[in-house]
């Protein structure tokens, strides 16, 4: 069972609304630098699905649940969240993973 002090690794799946691919991409890229500066952030990398342009995956890792919660309360993440409904074809999906091998 996962403890609140355990490292959190996840993939966020974000699918752009029709015609919003570039705007979504720009908004996601704005999150990278400030998130990487957060003391609890371990990894934050954006990918786009080759076979499905406009479907983005954000690989992210935080030292614990509190660090992820803190990230979600930042001004820049809240600014993105306020725009998300207009940009996304469906709600953001956050998939949590358990690390099996050493990095």
Feature locations, PLM:
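Short, well-ordered beta-strand segments in beta-rich or mixed alpha/beta enzyme
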Residues: 8-15, 45-72
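Glycine-rich beta-strand-turn "strand-cap" elements at beta-sheet edges
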Residues: 1-6, 46-52, 82-103
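Short, structured helix-loop boundary elements
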Residues: 21, 25, 55, 74-77
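An amphipathic, aromatic/His-enriched active-site/gating alpha helix that lines ligand/cofactor pockets
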Residues: 30, 36-42, 61-95
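N-terminal first-folded block
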Residues: 4-38, 42
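Generic "edge-of-domain/loop-turn" microfeature
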Residues: 19-21, 51, 67, 101-102
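Intrinsic disorder/low-complexity signal
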Residues: 5, 26, 42, 47, ...
């Amino acid at each position: 069972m996962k403890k609140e002090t355990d490292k959190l690794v996840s993939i966020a799946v974000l699918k752009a609304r029709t015609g919003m691919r570039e705007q979504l991409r720009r908004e996601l890229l704005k999150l990278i630098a400030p998130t990487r500066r957060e003391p609890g952030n371990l990894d934050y990398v954006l990918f786009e699905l080759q076979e499905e342009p406009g479907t983005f995956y954000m690989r992210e890792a935080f030292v614990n649940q509190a660090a992820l919660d803190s990230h979600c309360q930042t001004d820049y993440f809240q600014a993105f969240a306020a725009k998300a409904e207009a940009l996304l074809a469906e709600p953001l999906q956050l998939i949590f993973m358990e690390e099996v091998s050493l990095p």
